[in-house]
Structures are given as structure tokens and as C-alpha cells.
Regions:
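Non-ligating segments of multi-cofactor redox enzymes
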Residues: 1-123
Length: 123
């Protein structure tokens, strides 16, 4: 089975809720967001709009970040297709960051996650 997420961009109001819930779920440190929300102004006054585009890890079918990893620390779970990192194998070379087409890979040299003591959220 392969997981996916559908986002109705017409309903996105740029509240950053997806970004914050992802941050809480994964316990990332300050300044690290696995999800980002891009915004861009379009049109001219008085009909200006500002559409929002959530950018998440798309867990690619053939992830370039996994192929780029020299130690095999980046891998794909066979049961659900999600991309993950084995922190024990990671040497911190950051080639996965360079290879990610969505710029959604981050390096965290601090093992203690910002929300690490809370565990995963129930949803």
C-alpha cells in the first residue's frame, strides 16, 4: 500500500495548521519544518489574491534522496512506501538534502528532539 495526501488548494487559507501538526507529530527542533507553506501574490490591485501551496515530503516512488545516500541510512519502508532515516547509519554528509527535489530533507545533529519527551501524538 502507498500512502498519499490530497490537499484542496481552493480551501487552503494559509493557517499553517498542517505545518504545525507535522512539526508536533515528528518532534522536529526549532527552525526545522518537514512541511512548508508557500505563498505568492497574484494579480494587481484591486483584485490581488494570495494562493497558498503546502509542500510536504511526497514519499517519492523512486526517491532521489534514498539513491543519493552513500550509507543506506535513507530508505523506503516496503509496507507503506514512506521514506525514513536510520539515524544509526547516517554519517551526516547531507547528500540526501541536496538530492531532494522538494527541499524537504533536514539535518539534525541533536538527537534530542524539541518535542521528543512527548512521544507521538494520537492522530
Amino acid at each position: 500500500m502507498k500512502w498519499g495526501m490530497v490537499i484542496d488548494l481552493k480551501r487552503c487559507v494559509g493557517c499553517y495548521g498542517c505545518q504545525l501538526s507535522c512539526k508536533a507529530e515528528h518532534g522536529t527542533p526549532r527552525g526545522v519544518f518537514f512541511a512548508r507553506v508557500l505563498k505568492q501574490e497574484e494579480g494587481q490591485y484591486p483584485t490581488v489574491s494570495q494562493p497558498f501551496l503546502p509542500v510536504l515530503c511526497n514519499h517519492c516512488e523512486d526517491p532521489p534522496c534514498v539513491d543519493a545516500c552513500p550509507t543506506g541510512a535513507s530508505f523506503v519502508w516496503e509496507d507503506d512506501g514512506t521514506v525514513d532515516i536510520d539515524h544509526d547509519l547516517c554519517v551526516g554528509c547531507r547528500t540526501c538534502m541536496l538530492a531532494c527535489p522538494y527541499s524537504n530533507r533536514y539535518f539534525n545533529d541533536n538527537e534530542q528532539a524539541y518535542y521528543g519527551d512527548q512521544g507521538q501524538t494520537p492522530y
